[in-house]
Amino acid sequence: LIHFYNIKNKLFLSDLPGYGYAKAPKSKRFEWIKLMEGYFKNRSNLSRVFILIDARRGIKNSDHELMDLLNIIAVNFQCILTKIDKISSTALREVTASTLSQTEKYAASFPEILQSSSNKKIGIDKIHECLNLILNINNISKKE
């Protein structure tokens, strides 16, 4: 199941909820991976995939599976640590460093780890800046 969001006909977001849900049977997770692979391969206008990672948990095996897939099919991705208000500043520094060290091996990985908290509205402006930058880059390349 993929949820689609159209934002002012300028930005189209797709949400793949549950791909990392650990309690799902392996057969279901395999179906999700195949669905995602087909979706990502057939999207020529796909600029970047944002992988949301719970800062309390860090990168899970399912996240690595997704990163491997995106790297193989050459789709850029960037990690966003979520729920950063639920951990200490020391733990946040550690999970950020760990996430960066785990993702830098992927050629398709964007080298900046974003941080956010929807409850405290932390990092939302930075995510908006990132999306605006992507939109501006795409608009420039379409004009050329």
Which ranges hold each PLM region?
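Detector for Asparagine
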Residues: 6-9, 42-45, 61, 71, ...
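Conserved nucleotide-binding/hydrolysis micro-motifs of P-loop NTPases
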Residues: 11, 18-21, 56-58, 83-88, ...
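Canonical P-loop GTPase G-domain recognition
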Residues: 86-144
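Conserved C-terminal guanine-recognition region of P-loop GTPase G domains, centered on the G4
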Residues: 33-111
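Conserved G1/Walker A P-loop phosphate-binding module
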Residues: 1-28, 133-144
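Conserved beta-strand segments that form the floor/walls of ligand-binding pockets within enzyme
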Residues: 6, 51, 114
